A protein has these predicted regions:
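Leloir-type glycosyltransferase catalytic cores
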Residues: 23, 155-196
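Short acidic active-site motifs
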Residues: 107
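Structural alpha-helical scaffold elements that stabilize or flank donor/cofactor-binding regions
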Residues: 38, 110-111
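Oxyanion-binding "anion nests"
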Residues: 45-94
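A nucleotide-sugar donor-handling region in carbohydrate enzymes
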Residues: 1-55
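Active-site donor-binding acidic/aromatic loop of nucleotide-activated sugar
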Residues: 96-104
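A short acidic/histidine/glycine-rich donor-binding loop in glycosyltransferase catalytic cores
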Residues: 137, 152-157
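A donor-sugar binding/catalytic signature common to diverse glycosyltransferases
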Residues: 111-148
């Protein structure tokens, strides 16, 4: 209290909200990834996997790909070269899953924005999905972004569970979404800085 921190602390929201929205505008004007992959808006699910427990254990990785293959829905999977090699050396990929090279940020955010759903084990992508108003399925047993689960826009699924495809298909977030991470965050921050 002596330092005056309480009087000079302000809740503005998460700067990532503005970052995603501003970079999405750039991505939509510059990225050609949607045309390059020949996919239409909300015609595919976007998959990202990078956590050791999902990609280093060949049994879990194979299980996840087989479960996702059962959905029959098109899945775009930008895959790390090490994971791609493991997949190629171990088993075949279901026909509905298209492996692509890892994508740069603008191409990736364009893919996120056009996806029907996002399936991930990433922390940051869960939040990006929420900001972009995309249903998110997180292949983990916990999340650092509990708000996204509380708001019913993020479904946690244990990667070793069965019937993952049916759980994904039946997941439907509410129509309305609250701004749990804030809005106009940069504007609020600038106003506070200018007023100090």
């Amino acid at each position: 209290a002596k330092e005056g921190l309480a009087e000079n602390s302000f809740l503005t929201g998460d700067i990532m909200v503005d970052t995603v929205k501003n970079n999405l505008e750039i991505a939509l004007s510059k990225s050609t990834i949607i045309q390059d992959l020949q996919v239409a808006n909300e015609e595919y699910n976007l998959l990202t996997l990078h956590r050791n427990y999902n990609v280093d254990d060949t049994n879990i990785l194979e299980h996840l790909l087989n479960e996702l293959g059962e959905s029959g829905e098109k899945i775009i999977f930008p895959v790390h070269p090490r994971t791609r090699k493991m997949i190629a050396d171990t088993y075949s990929v279901p026909k509905n899953i298209e492996l692509t090279d890892p994508q740069g940020y603008f191409d990736f955010i364009a893919l996120e924005n056009s996806a029907k759903r996002i399936i991930t084990d990433s922390g940051g992508i869960q939040k990006e999905a929420y900001i972009l108003k995309k249903p998110c399925i997180t292949l983990r047993t916990e999340t650092e972004w509990v708000e996204t689960v509380d708001e019913k826009w993020n479904l946690l699924i244990n990667p070793s569970e069965k019937n993952i495809a049916s759980k994904i298909a039946s997941f439907s977030p509410p129509e309305n979404q609250r701004d749990v991470f804030g809005k106009n965050v940069t504007e609020k921050m600038l106003k506070i800085i200018n007023d100090i």
